[in-house]
Amino acid sequence: MSGDTCLCPASGAKPKISGFKGGGLGNKYVQLNVGGSLYYTTVRALTRHDTMLKAMFSGRMEVLTDKEGWILIDRCGKHFGTILNYLRDDTITLPQSRQEIQELMAEAKYYLIQGLVSTCQTALQDKKDSYQPVCNIPIITSLREEDRLIESSTKPVVKLLYNRSNNKYSYTSNSDDHLLKNIELFDKLSLRFNGRVLFIKDVIGDEICCWSFYGQGRKLAEVCCTSIVYATEKKQTKVEFPEARIYEETLNVLLYETPRVPDNSLLEATSRSRSQASPSEDEDTFELRDRVRRIHVKRYSTYDDRQLGHQSTHRD
């Protein structure tokens, strides 16, 4: 049994220095105050290994006690519970953080627990060999995996879908260049905002090039960069590079960096208010259109430069 309560000694009280008589007291519980953290454990656990603690509780070293009988150890008590677990049964669950493992190893060295020191050294070496990159971009393998990534993310999400195999026609002259520019912009944004936004790639989706933006598990906007145009007597696929719009939507998702809590005002900040809907729209139509903002790029004919569509913002 252990605790983490800070002990405030009474004013004027002085610790008592004495030798601990541990003979025949293996099952006796002792009270330890390690840097203000309080622990109860048995003498048997403290003397199982040949450590400094065994020397303290076998009478070979003097110990300090306060007037309430707590044995004082002038060390940080943060990892002492972990040390006790190791002393009891030689097993341990190490912290995930490299820094905390280093802290634990420093305490193990102080108490001369060589087995625990070796375990920490091995774990640190393994972490060094399996170094995780600072900017880690997952490539999704299924819709289920995508849903889980987005739902579990504590950050806003930006997804780039690009899949040339979905194309049924030839490309316009600038499409390949624009596709590369979209990918390059994705990489640039990943390097710039990887600490604040989760960037994911999708190479199995049904589009050729499409950006999606999510906040608090909800899809906020979509920028579709492809369209079908007519050149002479055949159809062609056109890929655009709406750089300004992509930057705008990426900055918009940063509004959703806050912890995932219900925040209707934030969710409505980038969506059209109900009062702006035309009177002719019924409730079902409004709910459908209010679901997500989709942005389609300008579409031009490569045959006679007639504009087939215009830049529009609507909800799907």
From Swiss-Prot:
GO terms for biological process: cell migration; immune response; negative regulation of Rho protein signal transduction; positive regulation of DNA replication; proteasome-mediated ubiquitin-dependent protein catabolic process; protein homooligomerization; protein ubiquitination; stress fiber assembly. One of its GO terms (molecular function) is ubiquitin-protein transferase activity. Phosphorylation at Ser-280 by CK2 facilitates the nucleus localization and increases interaction with PCNA. The modification Phosphoserine is found at residues 278, 280. Residues 28-96 form the BTB domain. PROSITE patterns: BTB. GO terms for cellular component: Cul3-RING ubiquitin ligase complex; cytoplasm; endosome; nucleus. It is found in: Cytoplasm; Nucleus; Endosome. Component of the BCR(TNFAIP1) E3 ubiquitin ligase complex, at least composed of CUL3, TNFAIP1/BACURD2 and RBX1. Interacts with RHOA; with a preference for RhoA-GDP. Interacts with RHOB. Interacts with PCNA. Interacts with CSNK2B. Substrate-specific adapter of a BCR (BTB-CUL3-RBX1) E3 ubiquitin-protein ligase complex involved in regulation of cytoskeleton structure. The BCR(TNFAIP1) E3 ubiquitin ligase complex mediates the ubiquitination of RHOA, leading to its degradation by the proteasome, thereby regulating the actin cytoskeleton and cell migration. Its interaction with RHOB may regulate apoptosis. May enhance the PCNA-dependent DNA polymerase delta activity. Belongs to the BACURD family. This is BTB/POZ domain-containing adapter for CUL3-mediated RhoA degradation protein 2. It comes from Mus musculus (Mouse).
